[in-house]
Amino acid sequence: MVFTNKIKDISSIGIADIIGAGTSALFWFFIASIAGPEGYGETTYFISIAVLSSNIALFGAVNTNIVYTAKNIQIQSTLYIITLCTGLISLFVVLLFFNNLGASFLILGLVIFGLSTSELLGKKLYQTYSKFVITQRILMITCGIGLYYIFGIQGVLLGYSISYLPYIYVIIKTLRTVKIDFSLFK
């Protein structure tokens, strides 16, 4: 029974990631075909800036969250506050230097994504993780394409950012239930 549950858990992660990767590939091929080389290049340039900035803001928080959550050490809220603050600083720095609202908000979306998924995986909520991944990809496609036709390339970045909104639920739920305790950082 335990073995079949583990296979089921691993399968749900694998299937969600495969579906997510496949839909993402189709989405980006579609965006490349309608935006043209210059528009697609600009999009990937700003996504690269957002990914780099979010990785700086997350600096080890994802792995820390997975390990401590799995050990049932209640560090999440403290980690979230620190990481979200660094994410907001990154957002404003990118907005100041590149004047791109889509890339700036994408930083915050990627930070929220990293923190939320690390908690879900640390708690071994694999099916919940799968639902969030598939929901995010559906939102990425609908918002990204929809906003492209309204705002152009900037709309793709905004749509991509908006697609991470469901993950806020995990953050808010944790902030309400887990006490902030800076003494855990020794």
Can you say where each PLM-predicted feature lies in the sequence?
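Signature of the first transmembrane helix
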Residues: F3-F59
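Transmembrane-helix boundary and interhelical linker motifs in polytopic inner-membrane proteins
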Residues: F3-T4, A35-G39, A50-L84, L121-Q127
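Hydrophobic alpha-helix/TM-entry signal in multi-pass membrane transporters
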Residues: N5-I13, L79, Y129-F132, K186
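Alpha-helical transmembrane segments of multi-pass membrane proteins
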Residues: K8, S12, A16, F46, ...
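Hydrophobic/aromatic positions within or immediately flanking transmembrane alpha-helices
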Residues: G14, G41-T44, Y80, S130, ...
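Transmembrane alpha-helix boundary and packing residues in multipass membrane permease domains
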Residues: D17, F29-S33, I47, N63, ...
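Alpha-helical transmembrane segments and their lipid-water interface positions
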Residues: G20, S24, W28, S54-V62, ...
